[in-house]
Each structure stands twice: as structure tokens, then as C-alpha cells.
């Protein structure tokens, strides 16, 4: 059997031996060179021919030739995961692989995109015109958007859009996280009940998803982290299709400052930076790509979380500590309504401007409300549930505090509308989420006499101003939260 023919690749004053057959097999550059009959090789009187290369780095060329000598196999290549995360190694290797057109190596990189190298690989894919690698990096960065934002290299890629209508990389990633299917997800301490279509085995799940076509709830293939079990009075908000659960208190009455985020695209929980202040019974609001933790039990300060730094910083505090209030974002501002000050009912609507870091008195109300939930659509705030106490001369008599109502407040016209009420459903301790064309509400049926909190599930249609009742929620439970998240389409998982 004849010995394998070798070729020497010369770069400056160094030579690297490589199998000629493997070189032709793996490198489109050399395959074209040999097939065209071109002769750039120097053939000495004794020994293998020598191919001269210029302009490449020695470390990058060595890595590519090692890959070629390994027959294009990852197992025999010898490059570690740590080396694949080093920017200098990647830069020199991709440069050499692109020049020599070693497509198998470039294709291999598609499956080795990691948090430590995704930004550098994305940059290199742009430089060397590698669309498949660029797409692989974009997909990875969409999956782990907030973790990628924290990377120190990320700001270096944020070049301004080249033409009107173009989006920055950050905006493209943010929008791509919303391309799945909007799904209602419920979290809580579920105590039992016949989960459709089959009862669960063992411990009850702590996360459920709602399938609208069948009107059934199914266990989500994940559970709350142990640190979140038995936590009450926490703040929750959706930011960039992450569900944040922040603060609260344990059943031992100890307040906490911990923060966690659930990524529905990867179905993972991550712990993020803790707040500076332990707080419970506060409001967490997402606005302008940041989170604001507002007030709390006997607390007036406000903290802002920036996912790009994974850090909380204090901003302008509330004018006064508030209890049993609610807050939401509307057109880039935060509105706080209802509750109590340390001395009296809070009849003021407070507005916070993030850019000015300033709280102002927006308007004074004739109706006092507490323990309500709030969501917004365009310039309209919807107030769901809570306890109403009308103070004006036209107030209604014999009004039950514990019934489900929906009101709206237009922040432009400053007009209140009393939209709908449901006297058989409780307006207290409910949870709701804006989802598609309505507000989905998990409430309690006040006509049932039971010690268990059996929840009812209904929807207020914003456009039709009507209630729509669904099949009874399939589990008893408490400490429930309902949210609307984008889950990946089945074809993409």
C-alpha cells in the first residue's frame, strides 16, 4: 500500500504538513487550485511539494490544517470548548477557514455557538459573509437575549441602522422573541383537582399552560425553582418575553429581595440580580425595556432593573408610602392609582416619567379603589376588580365591595368609564393578564361555600365590552398568577 502523499503549506518561514487528498477533499480553495491546473506549488527535487500562502495568521492556519488532517471530524481535531470561546482564536481560525473555503469547519461552528462566543462569531460571520453562521448566532441570541445583553462585547455590535426603517441588532432580537404563539401560563400552589385531559401523577405541577382550541389546561414541563416555593406578595412583570418574579415574603414572614426570570423559549428559570431593598406587596412594572419595583410594605423607594447590566438602582421614590395600590405602564409612563397613604385614602393618580425620573400628581379621583389590578391598551388603562368606594354626590348605594368590575381610564381625555360588572365573581385576590383581544381573569366564585379557593376563569372582551366564561379552572390552589407569554411554535422546538 502506497504511503499517503503529503503537501507542505508554507506561511512565511514555517511549513505545515497536510495530507494532499484530505486537503483537496476539505478545502474548496485547494480543490479548485488543483483541478484548474494552476501551479502555485514549489516542487523541490526531494520531498513533498510546497504550497505558499500569505496574509493569514500562523495559529489560525494551524487550527484549520489540524481540522483537515483530522478528516473534518470534530473528535480528532483537539480544539477545546474554552478555545472556541476565545475571540482571538476564533478570529484567526475563521479568517483562515474562510480563505481556504473549508466549509465543513465553518458548518461545524453552527453547532458550537455559545454564550461566550456568539457575539464574536456573529461579527466574524458579517465580516466574511457567512449567512448560515450569522443566522445561527442570531437564533442563539434570541433564545438567551438578556444574558447576551450583559456581555461586555454587545455594545460594540450596536452600530446605527444603515438606512431608514432598518432595526438595530438589539431591536431585531427583541422583536424575534415575540414570534412564537401567545399562550396563557398560570403559576401557583395547586392543591389538586382533575387536570384535563389526565390527572397528574405525584406532586402537583406549579406551572400550567392554556390551550385555547380545547379550552383545557395542561402541565408545563417545568416547575418553580425551590427558592420561589411558598413565596407570597411578590412582584411580577413581563419584559422582553421573560416572566420576572421578584421579592415577596416567605411564609415565615421574612421579606426577600431575590429576583428570578422565566424564559419560555428555553423553558428555563434563571436567578438574576437581587434588589437592593427587600420588599413585598409592591408593584413590578415593565417600561422602556426596564423594570421598576415600586413601593412595598411601609416602603416608598423605587428601584429600576436594567437587564443590560443585570443590576438594580434606586430612582425617584414615591411621594408617600402606599399600601394596597396598583400600577401599570401606559404610553411609556407609569401610573399609580388607589390604595392608602399612612394617613388616609390615596385619591391621587400619580404619574412617573422614566426619562425625567420624576413623579407628578396627574389627577385627583372621586372614587377610591384598592387591591385592584391594572393593564393598559394604547392610552387607556383598564382597572380590574378591587374594592370601590365612591365619594362623590352621585355615588351608588348598597354597592357590594366584593364583586368583579372593569373600569377604564383614558390618560389623554382623563375620562373614567364604568364598563362591566359581575356580581357573582369576586373582585379581590384575582389575577389577570392582557392576552389577544381581552383581559383574562382568574377569580373566585362568591356563590360557592367552600374552604378551598376554587378559581373561575373568564375573559373580558375589550372590543365587545362583554364577559366570556370558560370551563372551570381545573385545580384548587392559592397564590396564583396568570401571564401571557410567547411560547415557541412546535415546528421550531
UniProtKB/Swiss-Prot annotation:
Predominant location category: cytoplasm
GO cellular component, one term: spindle
Biological processes per GO annotation: cell division; proteasome-mediated ubiquitin-dependent protein catabolic process; protein polyubiquitination; regulation of microtubule-based process
Organismal lineage: Eukaryota, Metazoa, Chordata, Craniata, Vertebrata
Pfam families: Kelch_1
Pathway(s) per entry: Protein modification; protein ubiquitination
Assembly information from the UniProt record: Component of the BCR(KLHL42) E3 ubiquitin ligase complex, at least composed of CUL3 and KLHL42. Interacts (via the BTB domain) with CUL3. Interacts (via the kelch domains) with KATNA1.
Name of the gene this protein is made from: Klhl42
Kelch repeat start and end residues: 183-241, 242-289, 291-332, 334-379, 381-436, 438-487
Alphabetical keyword list: Cell cycle, Cell division, Cytoplasm, Cytoskeleton, Kelch repeat, Mitosis, Repeat, Ubl conjugation pathway
GO molecular function, a single term: ubiquitin-protein transferase activity
The protein's name: Kelch-like protein 42
UniProt xrefs under SUPFAM superfamilies: Kelch motif (SSF117281), POZ domain (SSF54695)
Domain annotation BTB: ranges: 5-77
Location relative to the cell: Cytoplasm; Cytoplasm, Cytoskeleton, Spindle
Its job: Substrate-specific adapter of a BCR (BTB-CUL3-RBX1) E3 ubiquitin-protein ligase complex required for mitotic progression and cytokinesis. The BCR(KLHL42) E3 ubiquitin ligase complex mediates the ubiquitination and subsequent degradation of KATNA1. Involved in microtubule dynamics throughout mitosis.
Amino acid at each position: 500500500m502506497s504511503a499517503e502523499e503529503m503537501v507542505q503549506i508554507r506561511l512565511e518561514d514555517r511549513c505545515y504538513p497536510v495530507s494532499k487528498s484530505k486537503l483537496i477533499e476539505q478545502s474548496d480553495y485547494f480543490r479548485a487550485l488543483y483541478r484548474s491546473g494552476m501551479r502555485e506549488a514549489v516542487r523541490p527535487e526531494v520531498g513533498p511539494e510546497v504550497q505558499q500562502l500569505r496574509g493569514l495568521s500562523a495559529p489560525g492556519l494551524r487550527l484549520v490544517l489540524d481540522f483537515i488532517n483530522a478528516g473534518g471530524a470534530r473528535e480528532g481535531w483537539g480544539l477545546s470548548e474554552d478555545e472556541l470561546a476565545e475571540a482571538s482564536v476564533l478570529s484567526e481560525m475563521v479568517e483562515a477557514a474562510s480563505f481556504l473555503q473549508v466549509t465543513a469547519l465553518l458548518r461545524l461552528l453552527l453547532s458550537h455557538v455559545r454564550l461566550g462566543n456568539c457575539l464574536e462569531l456573529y461579527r466574524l460571520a458579517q465580516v466574511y459573509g457567512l449567512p448560515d453562521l450569522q443566522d445561527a448566532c442570531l437564533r442563539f441570541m434570541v433564545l438567551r437575549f438578556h444574558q447576551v445583553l450583559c456581555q461586555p462585547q454587545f455594545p460594540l455590535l450596536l452600530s446605527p441602522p444603515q438606512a431608514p426603517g432598518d432595526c438595530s441588532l438589539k431591536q431585531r432580537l427583541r422583536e424575534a422573541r415575540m414570534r412564537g404563539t401567545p399562550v396563557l401560563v398560570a403559576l401557583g400552589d395547586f392543591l389538586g383537582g382533575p387536570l384535563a385531559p389526565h390527572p397528574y401523577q405525584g406532586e402537583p405541577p406549579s406551572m400550567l399552560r392554556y390551550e385555547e382550541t380545547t379550552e383545557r389546561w395542561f402541565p408545563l414541563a417545568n416547575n418553580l425553582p425551590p427558592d420561589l416555593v411558598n413565596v407570597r406578595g411578590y412582584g411580577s412583570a413581563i419584559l422582553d418575553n421573560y416572566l420576572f418574579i421578584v421579592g415577596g415574603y416567605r411564609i415565615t414572614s421574612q421579606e426577600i429581595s431575590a429576583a428570578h426570570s422565566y424564559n419560555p423559549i428555553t423553558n428555563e428559570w434563571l436567578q438574576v440580580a437581587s434588589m437592593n431593598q427587600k420588599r413585598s406587596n409592591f408593584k413590578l412594572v415593565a417600561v422602556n425595556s426596564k423594570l421598576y419595583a415600586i413601593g412595598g410594605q411601609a416602603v416608598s423607594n423605587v428601584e429600576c432593573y436594567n437587564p443590560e447590566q443585570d443590576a438594580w438602582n434606586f430612582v425617584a421614590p414615591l411621594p408617600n408610602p402606599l399600601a394596597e395600590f396598583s400600577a401599570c405602564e401606559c404610553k411609556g409612563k407609569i401610573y399609580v392609582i388607589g390604595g392608602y397613604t399612612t394617613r388616609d385614602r390615596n385619591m391621587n393618580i400619580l404619574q412617573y416619567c422614566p426619562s425625567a425620573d420624576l413623579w407628578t400628581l396627574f389627577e385627583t379621583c372621586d372614587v377610591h379603589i384598592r387591591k385592584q389590578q391594572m393593564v393598559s391598551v394604547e392610552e387607556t388603562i383598564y382597572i380590574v376588580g378591587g374594592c370601590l368606594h365612591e365619594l362623590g354626590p352621585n355615588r351608588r348605594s348598597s354597592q357590594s365591595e366584593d364583586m368583579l368590575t372593569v373600569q377604564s381610564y383614558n390618560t389623554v381625555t382623563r375620562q373614567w368609564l364604568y364598563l362591566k360588572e359581575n356580581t357573582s365573581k369576586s373582585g379581590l385576590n384575582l389575577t389577570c393578564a392582557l392576552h389577544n383581544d381581552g383581559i383574562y381573569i382568574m377569580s373566585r366564585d362568591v356563590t360557592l361555600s367552600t374552604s378551598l379557593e376554587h378559581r373561575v376563569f373568564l375573559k373580558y372582551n375589550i372590543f365587545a365590552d362583554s364577559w366570556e366564561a370558560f370551563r372551570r379552572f381545573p385545580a384548587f390552589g392559592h397564590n396564583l398568577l396568570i401571564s401571557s407569554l410567547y411560547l415557541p411554535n412546535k415546528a421550531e422546538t
